[in-house]
């Protein structure tokens, strides 16, 4: 059997005229040049060709490596499902500031200064390093300035600067983390203030600043109290009674306070 195209053989088997004689079929198969060629095929060959073609039809169609599917004609092979939503996370508990014992937190004097628009300068004495946040400084500035209509300035427009750069820490201690001398407490630090869009000093704040300045100028140190002082006070029983009362209040123990009173009094007498 000569080698011919599969479709050509199929067409010839189905539609071409045939002459059956002595168990043989004669088919006219067209050539590529337009002429026809007559070949003789036995019935066994016909059965083989039909079985071969049916085998080819049952096999999957092979596609080229660069074949592209039309997305409008090809449906999804798997159903499209939305991702499962996670359960909502519980809200974080709000942090409450616990009052610290007196003397447990180091303090510092904070000077806030705005060079222009508005020209503002004030101080916050005895400011705790670890508990005072940058937000607290913004609140202090916000209380002293207003916009052109007399309304409060938004906190987003108030910027706190340190060494001419916006601060990045949340508390004063974090801002001064690289300055251990200031973190020791008892020092002074100056922060710059910048208000986006400008502002003006509030009338109440200006009056308060002037009153504070006048109060400082008119301040006179109190005169010393007239009366016994020094060793003459220690020699009195009233002094030791007061000392014992203080110790009882702190220790909650009368016997221990009395014992310490005697011990301190004997030590004081032995110093002469």
UniProtKB/Swiss-Prot annotation:
Specify the superkingdom: Eukaryota
The organism encoding this protein is Aspergillus fumigatus (strain ATCC MYA-4609 / CBS 101355 / FGSC A1100 / Af293)
The answer to whether the entry has keyword Cytoplasm is yes
Q: Keywords in UniProt for this one?
A: Cytoplasm, Transport
In the UniProt record, which is one GO cellular component term? cytosolic small ribosomal subunit
Task: State the residue spans of region: Disordered.
Answer: 1-35, 85-105, 212-231
PANTHER family reported for this sequence: 40S RIBOSOMAL PROTEIN S30/UBIQUITIN-LIKE PROTEIN FUBI, UBIQUITIN-LIKE DOMAIN-CONTAINING PROTEIN
Family from the record: Belongs to the GET5 family.
Description of how the protein assembles with itself and partners: Forms homodimers via its C-terminal domain. Component of the get4/get5/sgt2 sorting complex. Binds directly sgt12 homodimers.
Protein's UniProt name: Golgi to ER traffic protein 5
Subcellular location(s) per record: Cytoplasm
Q: Where is the Ubiquitin-like domain?
A: 108-198
Task: Read off the domain note.
Answer: The C-terminal region (residues 201 to 272) is involved in homodimerization.
Described by its record, this protein's role is as follows:
Component of the get4/get5/sgt2 sorting complex involved in the GET (guided entry of TA proteins) pathway that leads to the insertion of tail-anchored (TA) proteins into the endoplasmic reticulum. Get4 and get5 form an obligate complex that catalyzes the transfer of tail-anchored proteins destined to the endoplasmic reticulum from sgt2 to the cytosolic targeting factor which then targets the TA protein to the ER membrane via get1/get2.
């Amino acid at each position: 059997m000569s080698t011919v195209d599969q479709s050509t053989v199929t067409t010839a088997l189905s539609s071409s005229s045939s002459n059956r004689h002595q168990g043989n079929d004669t088919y006219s198969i067209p050539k590529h040049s337009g002429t026809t060629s007559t070949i003789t095929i036995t019935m066994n060959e016909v059965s083989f060709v039909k079985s071969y073609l049916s085998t080819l039809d049952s096999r999957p169609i092979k596609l080229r490596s660069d074949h592209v599917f039309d997305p409008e004609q090809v449906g999804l092979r798997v159903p499209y499902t939305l991702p499962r939503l996670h359960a909502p996370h519980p809200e974080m508990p709000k942090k409450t500031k616990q009052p610290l014992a007196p003397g447990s937190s180091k303090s510092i004097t904070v000077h806030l200064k705005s060079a222009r628009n508005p020209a503002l300068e004030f101080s916050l004495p005895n400011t705790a390093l670890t508990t005072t946040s940058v937000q607290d400084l913004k609140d202090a500035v916000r209380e002293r300035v207003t916009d052109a209509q007399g309304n409060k300035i938004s906190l987003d427009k108030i910027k706190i600067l340190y060494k001419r750069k916006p601060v990045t820490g949340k508390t004063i201690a974090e801002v001064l983390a690289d300055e251990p001398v200031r973190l020791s407490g008892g020092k002074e630090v100056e922060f710059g203030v910048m208000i986006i869009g400008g502002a003006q000093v509030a009338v109440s704040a200006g009056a308060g600043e002037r009153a504070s300045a006048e109060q400082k100028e008119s301040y006179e140190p109190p005169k010393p109290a007239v009366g016994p002082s020094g060793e003459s006070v220690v020699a009195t029983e009233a002094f030791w009674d007061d000392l014992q009362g203080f110790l009882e209040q702190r220790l909650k123990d009368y016997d221990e306070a009395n014992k310490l009173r005697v011990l301190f009094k004997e030590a004081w007498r032995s110093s002469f």
